[in-house]
Amino acid sequence: MGDAILAGFSMGTGEVTRYLGRYGSSRVRKVVLLGAIPPFLLKRDDNPEGVDGKVFEDMKAAVVKDRYAYFKDFLDNFYNVDVLAPDRVSEQAWQASFAVAAASSPHASHACIDSWLADFRADLPRIDVPTLVVHGTEDRILPIAATADRLPGLIADLRLVRIEGGPHNIGWTHSEQVNRALLEFLA
């Protein structure tokens, strides 16, 4: 396989980034990152723009205490339902997402939070193909200031599309804008 377009959403953007960091882009033509997790989410001395580690510890504690309540809070912020429901996300769409989350492994629900803290900074310079990043300006899961807004300059050929008012799941709530950006980039 060659001439591939790699695309990822949320945690999947980390998978795409790590793949290119490890294996290079010889078989890849373009990259799409929707709701990007890179460069590095965790706040540290060498990453002051990151998110405080207590946020993630509190999330893991919430999963242990009552993962269904955690899923409700997470999905409310995934879609920004307080602002966008019912016009951009229906109760049925939210319930479908909840059903998927509830069917997940309890262990995976907890363990995946640590995977969000992977450091992709060394992988980013290896991305040497045209890259589209599409991110919601009101993303409460992966705040744009800690993620996508930091990518220009870290990836050589990057186009950043900021979806005004967009939550984390912009593919659902702002599909027209996301699809337009994708079609323009892939043309």
Which stretches of residues belong to each language-model region?
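Acidic beta-to-alpha connecting loop that harbors the catalytic carboxylate
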Residues: T137-R140, G165-P167
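Short beta-strand/loop motif that positions the catalytic acidic residue
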Residues: I127, V133-H135, D139
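Catalytic active-site module of serine/aspartate enzymes centered on a nucleophile-bearing elbow/loop
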Residues: A156-A187
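Conserved alpha/beta-hydrolase catalytic His-Asp/Glu region
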Residues: P39-G50, A61-P125
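Conserved alpha/beta-hydrolase "acid-adjacent" motif
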Residues: R140-A146
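Alpha/beta-hydrolase fold nucleophile elbow
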Residues: M1-S10
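Catalytic nucleophile serine of serine hydrolases
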Residues: S10-M11, G35
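Flexible "cap/lid" loop of the alpha/beta hydrolase fold
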Residues: T17-K65
